[in-house]
Amino acid sequence: MKKIIALLLAVVMVLSMGAMFSGCAADEPSVYYLNFKPEADAAWQELAALYTEQTGVKVTVVTAAGGEYESTLTAEMAKSEAPTLFQCGNQQALANWADYCLDLSDAAVTKEMTTDEYNIKDAEGKTRAIAYCYESYGIIVNTALLEQAGHSLNEITNFETLKAVAEDIHARAEELGFDAFSPAGLDGTSAWRFSGHLANLPMFYEFRDNNITEQPATVTGAYLENYKNIWDLYINNSSADPVNLSTSTSDESAAAFGTGKAVFYQNGSWEWASLTGKYGMNPADLAMIPIYCGVEGEEQAGLCSGTENCWAVNAKASEADQKATLDFLYWVVTSDEGTQMMADELGAVSFKNAKVPTNGFCADAQEYADAGCYNVSWAFNHTPNTEVWRSGVVSGLTAYSAGTGDWSAVETAFVEGWATQYAAQNG
């Protein structure tokens, strides 16, 4: 009997030890990054695997679908294993997630920055999120196709000249074998290009006129006719049927441009790697020009440059996971592997060890700036309840494009929707 009891005690001890060591393994520091940029998912996955291989620290990267970051973040933060690293791109995001944003003012990664101009700070001046890259967007041009159609970049200096070139190409699309614009898709993967980035144009000019630098309670929509100008040009000079834009995807638009079926493609510097890599486009055949919409003096406009790409570290994560996350970020911005990925995938970054970006669109942005052109800053960072407001604009654009509604629905969503969402956000 004593032998049996001793044996049972030994078994219990072994099981207890196993459970203890299992618990220790589960408590090892780790990093969970909820990535904002679908186009950079593969690069982040590769970098995370490399870091884990070198350090033994597990890094998990999950990428939210385009246009669904806020809802994905909300769902993930409610889980027991929440992101330790996430996106907090503007003051509205900080208002939503202030309790989750660790003070990064004295973090080693923050001290590696060359400027704090775009960092997100709270009312006390504490840095709650750091800007890890600066981007530009505009109209990407296949200059080889443009020249094949008998035109050149030098012709396009404002909306009137852009319209003339685009309409000529569209009229001869069958003969040329390509059209003017890639599809202006309004499905969830693509709509942000137009409810956010294109809608920035009327916001920017209205805010500039009125010296608005903080989120306003209301907007007038003074430049919505200009928004209509460029939207009409997009949807009426493309191979895509405007009736079907609600199901047209980001991938379809990229493929149309990347495979030589369209001359113009509204998107940003983040597409450089995909266009030259996945689609094998010749870098010499790519350029980015401003989005012209008929505003007086737009001949002096540059690209739309700014950022909403800001890292925040989860203040509610364990101290061990916070440290692991900060160590990972420091490695990303100082190591050869990390800085090379950032240069290749993200373009312009403001860290001391940053490599020169190979991204030609970043060079285009700098060329406009050097020529004295004004930057079209990212006014959309002031949008209240961003995803809800944008969904209203998308609904208006969808109905208008399909012929089941008129432009007034877009105006209502833009102006009245702004006031409604501001009130909802600010109480």
Model-derived regions: residue spans:
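Conserved C-terminal helix/tail region of periplasmic/extracytoplasmic solute-binding proteins
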Residues: 147, 171, 336-339, 358, ...
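Extracytoplasmic/periplasmic substrate-recognition and gating elements
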Residues: 54, 79, 149, 278-344
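Extracytoplasmic "Venus flytrap"/periplasmic binding protein-like
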Residues: 50-115, 144-150, 157, 263-264
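Short, solvent-exposed loop/beta-turn-alpha elements that line the ligand-binding surface or hinge
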Residues: 103-117, 155, 185-188, 203-229, ...
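Extracytoplasmic/periplasmic solute-binding protein
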Residues: 128-132, 137, 163-216, 262
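Hinge/lid segment of periplasmic solute-binding proteins
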Residues: 89-147, 193, 197, 285-290
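Glycine-centered hinge/linker elements that transmit conformational signals in sensory
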Residues: 166-167, 213-247
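Short, well-ordered beta-strand elements
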Residues: 27-38, 57-62, 85, 128
